[in-house]
Amino acid sequence: MLNKDYYIILSMLETIEKIVRYTSGYHSAEELYKNDRDFDAAMMNFIVIGEQVGKLTDDLKLKNKQINWQKIYSLRNILAHHYFGINVDIVWQIISIDLPKLKNELQNLENLTLD
């Protein structure tokens, strides 16, 4: 992995941690949605993750097809361009199910660079 990719992966992991902090006290999509600040902060950080994916090299993405890079970038586009029409239940599913998986995959990529 190139140094550029390594630092982007680290940044993505930090961004995931922010989302976790902003959303950890909530038990449902509706509960999170009612808190404008935390909801908006989490959504903005999903956009940031999508932007970070766009900066990764094609080589890294091709070698790590277990991560659906296009789906992550597509979420960024949906949130950035259709913010008022997003389904909060889908966002909640992403936060509670998909984000921990992505974090694990990115940590594995980070560890590969240390070998």
Feature locations, PLM:
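Solvent-exposed interaction patches of small proteins and small membrane subunits
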Residues: 1-115
